[in-house]
Amino acid sequence: MPTSKKLKEALAKVDRSKSYTLKDGIELVKNTAFAKFTETVDVAVRLGVDPRHADQMVRGAVVLPNGLGKDVRVLVFAKGEKEKEARDAGADFVGADDLVAKIQEGWFDFDTAIATPDMMGVVGKIGKLLGPRGLMPNPKVGTVTFDVGRAVNESKSGKVEFRVEKAGIIHAPVGKVSFDADKLKENILALVDALVKSKPSAAKGTYIKKISVSSTMGPGVNLDVSDVSSQVV
């Protein structure tokens, strides 16, 4: 596929051999976004872990201080009082076997799934459908809980789940290019802080090896790891 003129222009603005400060990197990403839609800003972090070993797995979640700039559709598997709690908190879809049946028929019009622990037997029936889509509730990221009100609020506020991939890389959205630079900065630092706090004790050597940031359609911009790390509180 030929490289578009706009992408070529964006690529020309980025020095791929350079590592930019967080401030300059964010400005560059905002300036190289060229799509007609409001692009998402994504961060990729290469970690010094080998996820093939269970004791080096990095997985968790973080509530970004400035959200993601999008409406997150939340589904909750719950019954009784917890069903009411989920609805009162603003969940978009709440139910049990009825939702399982819908999903078995191919319905996936939601972004996050939460379940109370007593519902996991029911949810397990559709694990093979939810898992590959990253929608399976998991206690490690706070989506299997009796505190459904809090879980719904966090998801609606911009909770991002992260999980290290085979190559030791974590990908996560941190907002929109339309965000103020300071808001993107705060979100990126919150993500990096969460990654640092999730460092496995078995990880040796340099933990955060590389950080890059990009818009949905734009080029990747390498960040100076030491500059970013020095700003993490």
From Swiss-Prot:
<keyword id="KW-0694">RNA-binding</keyword>
<dbReference type="InterPro" id="IPR023674">
    <property type="entry name" value="Ribosomal_uL1-like"/>
</dbReference>
<comment type="function">
    <text>Protein L1 is also a translational repressor protein, it controls the translation of the L11 operon by binding to its mRNA.</text>
</comment>
<keyword id="KW-0678">Repressor</keyword>
<dbReference type="GO" id="GO:0006417">
    <property type="term" value="P:regulation of translation"/>
</dbReference>
<dbReference type="GO" id="GO:0000049">
    <property type="term" value="F:tRNA binding"/>
</dbReference>
<keyword id="KW-0689">Ribosomal protein</keyword>
<comment type="subunit">
    <text>Part of the 50S ribosomal subunit.</text>
</comment>
<dbReference type="InterPro" id="IPR028364">
    <property type="entry name" value="Ribosomal_uL1/biogenesis"/>
</dbReference>
<keyword id="KW-0810">Translation regulation</keyword>
<keyword id="KW-0687">Ribonucleoprotein</keyword>
<dbReference type="GO" id="GO:0019843">
    <property type="term" value="F:rRNA binding"/>
</dbReference>
<keyword id="KW-0699">rRNA-binding</keyword>
<protein>
    <recommendedName>
        <fullName>Large ribosomal subunit protein uL1</fullName>
    </recommendedName>
</protein>
<dbReference type="Pfam" id="PF00687">
    <property type="entry name" value="Ribosomal_L1"/>
</dbReference>
<dbReference type="GO" id="GO:0022625">
    <property type="term" value="C:cytosolic large ribosomal subunit"/>
</dbReference>
<dbReference type="GO" id="GO:0003735">
    <property type="term" value="F:structural constituent of ribosome"/>
</dbReference>
<keyword id="KW-0820">tRNA-binding</keyword>
<dbReference type="InterPro" id="IPR002143">
    <property type="entry name" value="Ribosomal_uL1"/>
</dbReference>
<dbReference type="InterPro" id="IPR005878">
    <property type="entry name" value="Ribosom_uL1_bac-type"/>
</dbReference>
<comment type="function">
    <text>Binds directly to 23S rRNA. The L1 stalk is quite mobile in the ribosome, and is involved in E site tRNA release.</text>
</comment>
<dbReference type="InterPro" id="IPR016095">
    <property type="entry name" value="Ribosomal_uL1_3-a/b-sand"/>
</dbReference>
<dbReference type="InterPro" id="IPR023673">
    <property type="entry name" value="Ribosomal_uL1_CS"/>
</dbReference>
<dbReference type="GO" id="GO:0006412">
    <property type="term" value="P:translation"/>
</dbReference>
<comment type="similarity">
    <text>Belongs to the universal ribosomal protein uL1 family.</text>
</comment>
